[in-house]
């Protein structure tokens, strides 16, 4: 399979329509290239509300996906895909948050940046078509708590790093796509 643009970053706020947009793009690419469509989930159902969110995404997505879970070791999971795969990762900010809690009181910019750098390297080198979904969390006020600032700052840097490595970057607001970076193909 050959596709001149095989890395896409889809950004948006909560319930903005970013997952739906990314799912449609993944299905379209899978059909165009007769490729296997993979969904890599990063969320863990740690409470009832999160379990309901996960269920909502699963039912909205429908059949035909090879599903994988990677709440922490996302780079390792992505390195397993090849040129015949279309891979949708939903969502990077949940993944970053998982690492923040995994590190606990030892969480730091350096540790989170190391995980993001590892992920960005794998995304750049992967032969697979990868569609990444992430929350744009930097449009609000600066959070008051240290852990919240650590998360927001690192999420912003993560999105910048991955946007540099992706061929296309789209911001979804109110269900509408706004192209931020384009290689000419979506």
What do the PLM-derived regions correspond to, one by one?
Residues 1-18, 28, 34, 40, ...:
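Charged, low-complexity C-terminal accessory regions
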Residues 1-5, 86-89, 114-119:
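SAM-dependent methyltransferases
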Residues 4, 51, 55-58, 90-103, ...:
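Short, basic/glycine-rich phosphate-binding loops at helix/coil junctions
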Residues 6-81:
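Conserved P-loop
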Residues 8-10, 37, 85-91, 128-132:
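Generic beta-sheet signal
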Residues 22, 57, 88, 135, ...:
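Residue-level signal for inorganic ion chemistry
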Residues 63-111:
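Helix-adjacent hinge/juxtasegments
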């Amino acid at each position: 399979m050959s596709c001149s643009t095989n890395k896409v970053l889809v950004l948006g706020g909560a319930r903005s329509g970013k997952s739906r947009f990314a799912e449609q793009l993944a299905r379209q690419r899978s059909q165009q290239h007769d490729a296997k469509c993979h969904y890599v989930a990063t969320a863990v159902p740690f409470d009832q509300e999160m379990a309901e969110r996960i269920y909502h995404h699963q039912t909205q997505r429908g059949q035909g996906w090879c599903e994988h879970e990677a709440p922490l070791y996302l780079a390792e999971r992505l390195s397993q895909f090849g040129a015949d795969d279309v891979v949708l990762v939903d969502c990077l900010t949940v993944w970053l948050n998982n690492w923040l809690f995994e590190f606990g009181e030892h969480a730091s910019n350096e540790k989170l940046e190391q995980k993001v750098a590892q992920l960005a390297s794998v995304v750049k080198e992967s032969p697979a078509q990868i569609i990444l979904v992430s929350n744009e969390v930097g449009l609000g006020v600066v959070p008051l708590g240290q852990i919240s600032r650590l998360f927001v700052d690192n999420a912003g840097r993560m999105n910048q790093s991955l946007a540099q490595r992706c061929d296309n970057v789209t911001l979804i607001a109110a269900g509408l796509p706004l192209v931020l970076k384009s290689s000419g193909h979506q």
